Every structure is written in C-alpha cells, then in structure tokens.
Amino acid sequence: MEPHDQSGSTTRQLDEIRDRRGSQIRSVRLLPWRPFTRFPVCPSGTSPYSRGTHSQPSYVRCQNCERARQWFRAHDGPRCLHQRPDYSRLQAPPDPFQHLNSFEPILLAALSVLRPLPRDIQITIISCACDYFHSVRCASSRYLGSSRSAVKRRAARLNYCYKCGHPLYLNKPHTCRPGRLCSASISERLALLREGPIRSLTENPINARAAHFLAHELLDPR
C-alpha cells in the first residue's frame, strides 16, 4: 500500500470522528442553569415543562424542585425531600465551630502555627492580634448604627414614628409631614432616633455643653 493511501485512510477516519462528535454536540440540549440547593432535588426530565403538563390546572408546580404533582391523586411517598412529613425537623449537619465566633478559629490557627516560636514572640503577636480585633469590634458597637434599618428598629423600640417623630403610643392617626411644623422637641426626638441615645447624649451640642459645664464644676479646684 502506498503512503498516500495510508494518509487518505487516516484523514477519512478523522473526518468520521469529527462528524460523530459534531452530531453528538448538536444533539445536546442546553438546559437552564439552576443554583445549588441545600437539599437534593428530584431528577431532571420530570419537571412539568419537560412533560408539557405545566399548563394543566390540576398540576401544582413545586417551588423547591420545580416538579409537578397532582392534588387529587395518590402517589407512592414523597417525591422530594421537602415533601416529607418531618421536613421541618430536618437539620443540617452541625458546624464544629458553631460555639466559636468569627475570630477564634483564626486565633486557634495562629496558635498552632506559632507553636515552634519562643514564648515572648507568641505573646507579642497574639496581643497585637487581640488589640486589633478589639479595635475593629469597638468600631461598630451595638446600638450605635445610623442606617435606615437602625433608625426603624430604634423607633419601633421607643414606639415613635421614624419619619416625623410622632409618638405612636397615643393611638391617634397622624399624617407624616417630615420637615414641616418641626418644633424643638420634635427635632430633638428625630435626632435621638437617627443618632441613638448614646451618640445623642455625647455628641449633641446641648448635651455636650451640659456635660462640659458639669465637668468644669467637678474639676474646678476652687
């Protein structure tokens, strides 16, 4: 057999392989992307859209596995995990670090790495890390938030309207008109809701002047 005949047979085999791969790729039906779920879902190919039964009113579409089931029809057991009677009692596997906060696992890892170092170096590094963590935690202390959600939570706790500062414990209907007919008491109330009691007592100019006067009276040596 001539060399050019061998090359021709090899080229023919490669063409057959390419055609076969192309037909396989064309036969693949692209499915929509589904996000990962916490529990296993029903197998693919059994959804109401693949069976063409999504338009029938007797079928109810499941929100978790997107599978159709009939209300008035007996079926053999739950078709999805969330349809089990004890689904509300199912729990995820326990986290081994659930009793620790977000910083303690990092601290434990740092201790395991610093074990071969001398004792004084270990104490210095851990003290610096703890000081930094304490400063970060103190930067966003509790009850000092100034966001809209924090204002709403504070107003709900103090039973005031977060828009206009109207007291809600009077059980009287009111029209929220923020910025209009704002008296000194309402402005102080709104400042208290927006800044919080701690920041309002420490940073409000009126309270700051009073605190300065008391400090001057207490620290005056006369």
UniProtKB/Swiss-Prot annotation:
Question: Which superkingdom does the taxonomy of this entry point to?
Answer: Viruses
Biased amino acid composition, Polar residues: 1-12
Q: Which cysteines are joined by disulfide bonds?
A: none
For the region Disordered, what residue ranges are annotated?
1-21
Under Pfam families, the record lists: Viral_NABP
Q: Which residues cross the membrane?
A: none
Return the InterPro entries for the record: Viral_NABP (IPR008891)
What is the role of the protein in this entry?
May act as a regulatory factor during viral transcription.
Identify this protein by name. 23kDa protein
Organism, scientific name: Indian citrus ringspot virus (isolate Kinnow mandarin/India/K1/1996) (ICRSV)
Q: Identify the taxonomic lineage of the organism of origin.
A: Viruses, Riboviria, Orthornavirae, Kitrinoviricota, Alsuviricetes
